[in-house]
Amino acid sequence: MLATDLMIPAVADVRGTTITYYDSRDEKDRDDVLVMIHGTSGSTKAHFGFLFPILAAKQRVVSIDWTQPAPNGKPIELDQLVDQVAGAIEEILPGRKAFLLGYSLGAVVTAAVAARRPDLVERLVLVAGWMKTDLQQILRNDVWQALRASGDGAIRAYSTFCAFGGPFLASKTLADLQPGMDAMAFDAFGDQQMELNRRINIVEDVHRISAPTLVIGCTHDQMVPIRHQKALFGAIEDARFAEIPTGHAVVFERPSELTHHIQRFLDEPEAFTAGSIVPTPQP
């Protein structure tokens, strides 16, 4: 089956808000359903174009796209995105728990869902997430905001520089990266998410997470440095930690390695006990 056959959008009504989601539907004779939440300015197609069809080959996969919860120019709140995800799970998977995965800002949202709605979450994967925004992140955000306000095309180069790891960029040419830079889309909802990123603080939530959790950090991440994922690992009682040698854009740099860690946690949740460091897969 082609990826395009799986990634067909559907809609759910969540307390009067229309939420777009993608559902592979075939449960592959498994009880667990993987629910994925994208990151800042992303979508299912933008962030999970590789992961969705590969993971859907072994179990049912649902991926939820946020709906803009406030008018252009108005701030959005984390609680609004958390409510969208929790409500969508209740609507799409009534009476069931999800294997919940979040990437980047999606990891912040899913961590909060797991803390506040443990009845909805069986297990949790947090990819390149964080608990509390620090000064390094705010300074990077300041530069992004200035470039966005100026309309300078340099925002595409800056976003690429920040998203990918140094070793990955050093192995490419500008011509290799130009199509992706040209395809970047900027809109009001993305601007709202970038502003929200400045105000993240889920420290109290994270300490309440009870679901078995896999935290995945990225060695060369400049957007959410790996110390943040290590802090999540330390704060969640039933957590194990895996590290992938990429920048923040792990879903593009090493999607196969990322998929390996996710699938193993699905297939063998007891393979690594709480507090374990998951080894790098060997060829």
Feature names for model-found ranges:
Residues D13-P71:
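Conserved HGGG/HGGXW glycine-rich cap/lid loop of the alpha/beta-hydrolase fold
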Residues G49, V62-F99:
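Active-site loop/oxyanion-hole signature of alpha/beta-hydrolase fold enzymes
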Residues A111, A115, R123-G151:
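Flexible "cap/lid" loop of the alpha/beta hydrolase fold
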Residues L135-Q137, G153-D205:
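Conserved alpha/beta-hydrolase catalytic His-Asp/Glu region
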Residues I209, V215-G217, D221:
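Short beta-strand/loop motif that positions the catalytic acidic residue
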Residues T219-V224, A249:
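Acidic catalytic loop of the alpha/beta-hydrolase fold
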Residues T246-H260:
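Catalytic histidine-centered segment of alpha/beta-hydrolase-like enzymes
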